[in-house]
Amino acid sequence: TIGDRAVRESLDAVEAAQRANGGRDARHHLAHIQFVHPEDMPRFRKLGVVANAQPYRACREAYVTELTEPFVGPERSAYMYPFGSLHRAGARLAFGSDWTVSTPDPLQQLEVAVNRIRPDDRGADPLLPDEALDLGTALAAFTAGSAYVNFLDDETGSLEPGKLADIVVLDRDLFGIDGAQVADARVVLTLIEGEAVYSPSEPGW
């Protein structure tokens, strides 16, 4: 669902299915959501559809400036990767990498989500800065949001008693630094179900 028509028709399909079958915990999600018409943004919350996105592309890179904006025009370009608007409309967000098309590094993805500028191009102008997210919302999309859309929110995605200890420890507090430096953070420990699976100090990891 990259185009706004694809998004609208997908939302229409979910709405029709709910009318025919009644409500259920289906957790439908639309991936990519590069263009979402403003009229359709409130429908995500109304229908319980998750906005599943990969924020690394939400910046002024060649894919946007050379292959997208000249062809879709200024009207549609004004609602490209509208994460901020979707969040304000009450949509639940789930973020991922889209690897191998995009970087698998969530810290780089996070920096774009909060700045709309790529870490390797920090001097660039942001893409639609009003669509940037605060760090807490972006982190929740990568963690709790992704767990929710995969029906794993009872097991992982947040630090709560009884949930799996799936934890990444960084070398700095992301909330204590400039948002433009998020991607500079380094992982010092990764735990999966409480077991250490990565540390840069351990040979072979």
State the predicted function of each range:
Residues 1, 5-28, 32, 38-42, ...:
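His/Asp/Glu-enriched, well-ordered alpha-helical/loop segment
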Residues 200-205:
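Extracellular/periplasmic ectodomains of large secreted or surface enzymes and adhesion receptors
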